[in-house]
Amino acid sequence: MIPIANQVKMEEPTTPQTTTPAPPTSAPDALRGILPPNLLGQFHFHPAMAQVLAAQAQAAAAAQQATLAGFPGVPMFPHGIPADLKPEMLLGGGPGPMPMFFSDAHRLYHPYGLDGIKKRNATREATAPLKDWLHSHRKNPYPSKADKVMLAVGTGMTLTQVSTWFANARRRLKKENKMTWSPQNRRGDGCDDDEDDDDDDMNRPSSSTSINSERKGESLFGKPHLASPTPSGGSGGSDELTTPKKELVSPIPNDDSESPKRKPKMWSIADVTSDDDSSKKDSPPSSDENLLTGSLFQNAMKKQMEVMARLDPTLFRHTMHPFMFQLLAQQAAQGQQLALLAPQTTPPNEAGLNSQAETSTPSPASSPTSSPRSHQE
């Protein structure tokens, strides 16, 4: 007989077994058997070794950033290895030194304009406010500093660009003979630079090409010299061309030639003193005048020092520099030597007085002879 327990087990329905599907393989895993394992010339890390290296890199970056805390422009390093950056994809197979970048914006400047700041030329729309200002100030086209700042803000240009634009405009008007202002009618606030720019352009020497072009123009448009027959009646058929001889002009200017005088600038010490210097250069002082002025100056200084010494001798000794005493002693010795070497000449007034005294006073030889005669009489 079959036991009851076995019968019950046989009667129980069997449940169907469900199998779980395998996870889909990723692309690198799928290509692992096809591609070589060391494709980029790197070596593989064990997962545990990769984690240790990542922890070391993160700790080193944190320690370096902590030591540089408080300094401007602290370099920022990436903390560890990102999750999507596999260790085998790193250069050399490990984390290694990562490239650093700075947090300051001014350190991203590049001289070739890679930082987004590009130099651009001024357009007609940008210079329209400048033209309007120049049209409304024809009698005085010299903007002040406040006007330049206002125009620079309105046009998006710099102060240098605004000043250069106005200087070029004034030069262009001068060349076209459309100058409607007087050079003296200028504003005193920041207009000296503009006037200097104008003067530099006008006083700038012309280039060699322009001189050659002018000479060519003179030769082209000049009066042609016709051929004239020779006065001697030799051969009538042969005529010679007479060319006028040009006077050679020396490139070195003469002293008598009048050089164009430059307009003196306001508040210019050099221009104010230039006239005095030129007059002094015409008549150089002689050596006698120099000696006279030097002696007068020394005498005045000595008198002043004597007065100071009389007022307070102790203060004078303490405040006087020792080298000054030495200098005064040397000057006194030099004065004595000059006095001994100088020829002793009597002035004309003293000479005349001496001659008169000699004529008026009788000679000692004549006095004894005259006295006995008077007694005899």
UniProtKB/Swiss-Prot annotation:
Q: Which UniProt keywords apply?
A: DNA-binding, Homeobox, Nucleus
User: Spans of biased composition, class Acidic residues?
Assistant: 191-201
Which sections of the sequence are annotated for DNA binding? 120-177
Task: Tell me the protein family, please.
Answer: Belongs to the TALE/IRO homeobox family.
Query: Where located?
Result: Nucleus
Give the protein's function: Transcription factor. Required for D-type inhibitory GABAergic motor neuron synaptic remodeling, acting via degenerin unc-8-dependent and -independent mechanisms. Regulates expression of genes involved in synaptic remodeling, including negative modulation of immunoglobulin domain-containing protein oig-1 and positive modulation of unc-8.
Principal subcellular localization? nucleus
- Asked whether the UniProt record includes Acyltransferase among its keywords, one would answer no
Biological-process GO terms, alphabetical: cell development; negative regulation of transcription by RNA polymerase II; neuron differentiation; neuron remodeling; positive regulation of transcription by RNA polymerase II; regulation of transcription by RNA polymerase II
Q: Where is this region: Disordered?
A: 1-27, 176-292, 340-377
Q: Which PANTHER family match?
A: IROQUOIS-CLASS HOMEODOMAIN PROTEIN IRX, MIRROR, ISOFORM C
Pfam families registered for this protein in UniProt: Homeobox_KN
- The residue ranges crossing the membrane are none
GO molecular-function term, one example from the UniProt record: DNA-binding transcription factor activity, RNA polymerase II-specific
Knockout consequence?
RNAi-mediated knockdown delays the first appearance of synaptobrevin snb-1 at puncta, probably corresponding to neuromuscular junctions, in dorsal D (DD) motor neurons in L1 stage larvae by about 4 hours. Causes ectopic expression of immunoglobulin domain-containing protein oig-1 in late larval and adult DD motor neurons. Causes a significant increase in expression of snb-1 at puncta in the ventral nerve cord on an unc-55 mutant background. Ectopically expressed in ventral D (VD) motor neurons on an unc-55 mutant background. Restores normal backward locomotion on an unc-55 mutant background.
Q: Which CDD domains match?
A: homeodomain
A GO cellular-component term linked to this record: nucleus
**Annotated organism of origin:** Caenorhabditis elegans
Establish whether keyword DNA-binding is in the entry.
Answer: yes
Task: List where Low complexity composition bias occurs.
Answer: 359-377
Q: Quote the protein name from its UniProt record.
A: Putative iroquois-class homeodomain protein irx-1
